[in-house]
Amino acid sequence: MAVGKNKRLSKGKKGLKKKVVDPFTRKEWYDIKAPSTFENRNVGKTLVNKSTGLKNAADFLKGRVVEVCLADLQGSEDHSFRKVKLRVDEVQGKNLLTNFHGLDFTTDKLRSMVRKWQTLIEANVTVKTADDYVLRVFAIAFTRRQSNQIKKTSYAQSSHIRAIRKVISEILTREVQNATLAQLTSKLIPEVINKEIENATKDIFPLQNVHIRKVKLLKQPKFDLGALMTLHGESSGEEKGKKVAGGFKDEILETV
């Protein structure tokens, strides 16, 4: 008879549960701050694992991209169909300082603008801003009926479409090249460029629903902390000396 363990007697107790550890105990919250070009700078909060050993939480936060509705940033429902992407560039305490990373339209807004009896015109340009950000800007426009028109349709000819597309590309290139990223963002929010395109093309063919529907960041320059702090309305923390009024002369002691 073989001598060994009796498996029936040495079975462990069933029903013992493992200790459940809440995963949120290993995480911490950080506040996301939008640039000062937006009305509401408090975007929201994000989670990340706490810093342990060689793993630093800031390394996992930098480069994180969040998508926010522009209506929440501006406090107005007029911008509810536009989405803004913000990229985390710096971690300061529990605050995450972000920069503009892109702009896009919601799908329902784009579909609602496409209708019968009109022509859709699209144009896009790849331009470098004054502060060396390479952007690809997409514009969209639709033809409309003239004031004294009887015909139901408002289709544009191919020559009109080419001429309008050329004007749109020239305006987009000029506006992006002569502005920094922060200045361009302040123009995109109130849709200043859209009105300029509409006025410039009215002699070719009247347009409606002219929008910058998308802005895509292709390349960014080397990270500059001072520029980011200025964008957020804060100093870069560098202490600079002040010039003293009047000259300073050493006193010479004649007697010891």
From Swiss-Prot:
Cellular-component GO terms for this entry: cytosol; cytosolic small ribosomal subunit
Residues with the N-acetylalanine modification: A2
UniProt keywords, alphabetically: Acetylation, Cytoplasm, Ribonucleoprotein, Ribosomal protein
Entry's Gene Ontology BP terms: translation
MF annotations from Gene Ontology: structural constituent of ribosome
Cellular localization per UniProt: Cytoplasm
One Pfam family this sequence matches: Ribosomal_S3Ae
UniProt xrefs under HAMAP family: Ribosomal_eS1_euk (MF_03122)
Subunit architecture: Component of the small ribosomal subunit. Mature ribosomes consist of a small (40S) and a large (60S) subunit. The 40S subunit contains about 33 different proteins and 1 molecule of RNA (18S). The 60S subunit contains about 49 different proteins and 3 molecules of RNA (25S, 5.8S and 5S).
Family, similarity comment: Belongs to the eukaryotic ribosomal protein eS1 family.
Name of this chain's protein: Small ribosomal subunit protein eS1
Organism phylogeny: Eukaryota, Fungi, Dikarya, Ascomycota, Saccharomycotina
Gene: RPS1
